[in-house]
Amino acid sequence: MSRQLSRARPATVLGAMEMGRRMDAPTSAAVTRAFLERGHTEIDTAFLYSDGQSETILGGLGLRMGSSDCRVKIATKANPWIGNSLKPDSVRSQLETSLKRLQCPRVDLFYLHAPDHSAPVEETLRACHQLHQEGKFVELGLSNYAAWEVAEICTLCKSNGWILPTVYQGMYSATTRQVETELFPCLRHFGLRFYAYNPLAGGLLTGKYKYEDKDGKQPVGRFFGTQWAEIYRNHFWKEHHFEGIALVEKALQAAYGASAPSMTSAALRWMYHHSQLQGAHGDAVILGMSSLEQLEQNLAAAEEGPLEPAVVDAFNQAWHLFAHECPNYFI
C-alpha cells in the first residue's frame, strides 16, 4: 500500500552481521563511523554473528556503549542454536558474554533471536526480567516469533509483572510481505515497534543476480559459499521472485528512462515510503552491508524520496507473483 510523503520516515539501524566475516576490523570501523556521521545512532548485532567477532569488533571501537551519556544504542541477541538454548542459564551466559565482548555494562536492546520450543517460555521470560532488574539491558525484543507467540509472551509478561517486549525484528521487503497480514496488527495492539531485516531480500533485490546463477560457480556471498547460503537460497531464490524483479526493472525504465534509479535504490525507497512501516510508531529498517561503498549507497537510497506510482504498482505485482512462495516470517 502506498503511503504519503508527509508520514514520518522509519529510522535506520546499522546491521553488523558481516563484521568479522566479510568485513575486517578496519572496514567495520570505517562503516560504523560513516553510519554515525550521517546522524544515525542504532547498531544491531548478535551473540551468533561471525562467531562473536561482530560483537568483539564493535566493543573495540571505543564508543562507550551502554554508558548513560552515549548516544550510540546497541542491540544484541541470545539464540537457541549451535549448543545454546533459551533456558535461563544459557540466556544469562549469552548476554553476559555479549557484554564482555561489547565492553559495555548493558545493552540498550536485548532480543530473543528465535523461539526455543524445548525451553518453557515462562522460564525464559522470568530470566530476562531478572537480567533487566540487574541492569544488563534496557529494552526486551523478539525476533522470528509467530504472531500468536508474541501475543502469548506479552500476556504472560503483563500478568506476571515482567518486562514487556517493545521491539520485534522480522523479515520484510517489497517482495516478502507476509508480516503485514497478522503480525503487524498484533504488534500495533501490544505496542511493539517493528525493525525490518533483509529489506533487500538477502540481496536479491539488488538486481545483480540471475535465476540461472545457481547452476554455475559463484563468488562467496549471501547466496553462495557460506554456512547461511543454502538457507537464503531456499528463502528467496525462486523463479517467480526473479520474474517479479524483472517487472520492477521494466517499470523503472518506463517511468524514469535514462535517469532510472538502481533496483537497490528502488527497493529501499519502497521500504521507507510505501511499506507499512511507520516512523511515528518507531519502526526502522536494518541496513546490512559487506563494504563501506555498499553502506554509502544504501544510506543514500534511504534518504531519497518516494517512487513513481507505476513502480509501486510493479512492486505490488512482484509481491503477488511471489506471495505463494514467500518464506515464513517465523521459525
UniProtKB/Swiss-Prot annotation:
This is Aflatoxin B1 aldehyde reductase member 4. Substrate binds at H113, Y232. Disulfide bonds: none annotated. The modification Phosphoserine is found at S85. One of its GO terms (cellular component) is extracellular exosome. It comes from Homo sapiens (Human). The record marks K77 as: Lowers pKa of active site Tyr. Belongs to the aldo/keto reductase family. Aldo/keto reductase 2 subfamily.
